[in-house]
Each structure stands twice: as structure tokens, then as C-alpha cells.
């Protein structure tokens, strides 16, 4: 299973998190048996078949399953150092740890790689492997957990070989970007795109260790 994402557009209920599967019909049947039923009729995602899942069974998130891998998007020609190389991780703000574990682990079958609480950050973080990237699910410590409130899509982190080079290129193109700063994880560098990505909190992350994903 791998992941792609369609950013929210005007009039949309929210970002659509799309999970790519080898056998769409089998994946839809399995999701339904696990309490994650399809929502409405089959549609398309580009030239591929797509089935939305019921947000009421997914903590309020807009999820879908799509068939096959399909071609990627073409990228502009830029130097390797100043290029964004891949999506590193997707961040979800959750309201209930048990609900998040049930959705991403039990129902969707993603591999839980790490579950930790960090009082200094005021957060519990769960990291699920999804293809070549990571789903980071965050709960705020000190807040009562509830299933009465929906979970939220909370942003994207893109991977780059040289955060300073990418920040300089984007600033030169007129994007409103922050200064590059050290990340929370040792050996990382990060900056924020303040504007230019509608509705979507976005950061660019340099992993000096060269590993894929924010956490093992």
C-alpha cells in the first residue's frame, strides 16, 4: 500500500488522502469487513479507479482507495541540491489514540513503527509506515481523548537533500518561506512554506542521515 494526496479545493470538504492498492476490489471488500465501508459510487483519480471510504468510520477524515500505481508527475528541471525529492510524511491531528490505532493499524493495515509520548513537546506521536513514507498521527497531551470530534489533516513534510538550497530557490521564486532552522529530530533542518500551498500546512525537511520518513 502506498499513499498520495489531493489538496483541498474550493468547495471540497477537506483534503483527500488516497491509498494506492494492488487490487482495488479486494481492498474495498476487506475495508468493509473491517468496519470501513465505501461511500457512494466508484469514481476516478486521473485514469485510475477510486473508491471513497465513509468519513464517519474514519474519524472524520476523507480517505479513498485507488487502483494501481500509475505514472508520476513530471518535475521541472532544477539542480539536485535545490530540488524537493519526495514526500516524507503526512501529519494527522487525532482526538483518540485508540481510534487512530484502530483506523491506521487494524483497518487499513499500516505498520505501526513507533508510539511515543514526549511531555516536552506536549504530544503523543504514532508513526505508521505506508509504502516509502510515514503517516505521523499526533495527539495533544493533557487534552481529554474523545471520539465525538473528528480528526484533522494537519500538513505535509517534503524531503530535500539541501534545505537551504531549496529555501533559497523558493524564496527567489516569490514564495513566502521561513528561515531554515534545526528540526526537533537531531540532524534535521527544516523550513515552512507560509503561503502558496492552499489550505495545506507545509514544511520542507532535510534528513542528514539520509533515511526515508521522519521516524524509524
What is the predicted function of each stretch?
Residues 1-84, 86-96, 117-136, 146-171, ...:
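Vicinal oxygen chelate
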Residues 12-19, 64-101, 107, 153-156, ...:
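N-terminal beta-strand motif that seeds the catalytic metal site of vicinal oxygen chelate
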Residues 80-81, 145-147:
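Short, flexible, glycine/charge-rich loop motifs used to bind or transfer phosphoryl groups or to couple energy/partner
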Residues 85-143:
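A mid-sequence, solvent-exposed acidic-amphipathic segment
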Amino acid at each position: 500500500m502506498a499513499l498520495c494526496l489531493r489538496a483541498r479545493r474550493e468547495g471540497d470538504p477537506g483534503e483527500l488522502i488516497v491509498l494506492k492498492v494492488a487490487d482495488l476490489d479486494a481492498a474495498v471488500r476487506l475495508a468493509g469487513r473491517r468496519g470501513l465501508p465505501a461511500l457512494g459510487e466508484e469514481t476516478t483519480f486521473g485514469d485510475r479507479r477510486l473508491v471513497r471510504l465513509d468519513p464517519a468510520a474514519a474519524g472524520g477524515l476523507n480517505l479513498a482507495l485507488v487502483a494501481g500505481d500509475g505514472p508520476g508527475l513530471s518535475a521541472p528541471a532544477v539542480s539536485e541540491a535545490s530540488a524537493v525529492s519526495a514526500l516524507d510524511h503526512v501529519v494527522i491531528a487525532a482526538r483518540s489514540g485508540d481510534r487512530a490505532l484502530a483506523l491506521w493499524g487494524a483497518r487499513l493495515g499500516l505498520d505501526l513503527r513507533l508510539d511515543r509520548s514526549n511531555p516536552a513537546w506536549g504530544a503523543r506521536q504514532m508513526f505508521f509506515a505506508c509504502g516509502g513514507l510515514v503517516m505521523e498521527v499526533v495527539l495533544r497531551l493533557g487534552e481529554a481523548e474523545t471520539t465525538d470530534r473528528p480528526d484533522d489533516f494537519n500538513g505535509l513534510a517534503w524531503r530535500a537533500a539541501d534545505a537551504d538550497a531549496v529555501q533559497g530557490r523558493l524564496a527567489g521564486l516569490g514564495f513566502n518561506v521561513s528561515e531554515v532552522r534545526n528540526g526537533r529530530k537531531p540532524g534535521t533542518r527544516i523550513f515552512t512554506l507560509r503561503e502558496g500551498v492552499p489550505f495545506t500546512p507545509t514544511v520542507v525537511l532535510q534528513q542528514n542521515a539520509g533515511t526515508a520518513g521522519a521516524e524509524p
